[in-house]
């Protein structure tokens, strides 16, 4: 079975840090924040095997560009599968306007 190299963009890392900070500092739940951060990180790392298991997004032009979405609790991990690499672009709260936030990063 093919194994991919998983790369996380600076923006996606920042997204994860903001998720942690919000839960730890605003909601005053540091243990919950660490657990959520770890679940997202583990899910991202699992993309090294069978990254195509998650669906392409439904919106265009992101779908044509190969952007995929993986759900982790209440968060969406957006990534693109390349020849040997999985590139994680964003990690966003799923209840937000995902299309608008995805397009804002361009």
Question: How would you name each of these model-derived features?
Answer:
Residues 38-49, 66-73, 96-97, 105:
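Alpha-helix boundary/capping detector
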Residues 4, 9, 59-60, 70-74, ...:
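Surface-exposed loop/turn and secondary-structure junction residues enriched for glycine/proline
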Residues 7, 39, 53, 68, ...:
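Basic side chains
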Residues 50, 54-85:
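Basic/aromatic recognition patch in beta-strand/loop cores that engages polyanionic ligands
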Residues 1-63:
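Basic, Lys/Arg-enriched alpha-helical interface segments
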Residues 27, 72-76, 80-106:
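Enriched for short, Lys/Arg-rich terminal
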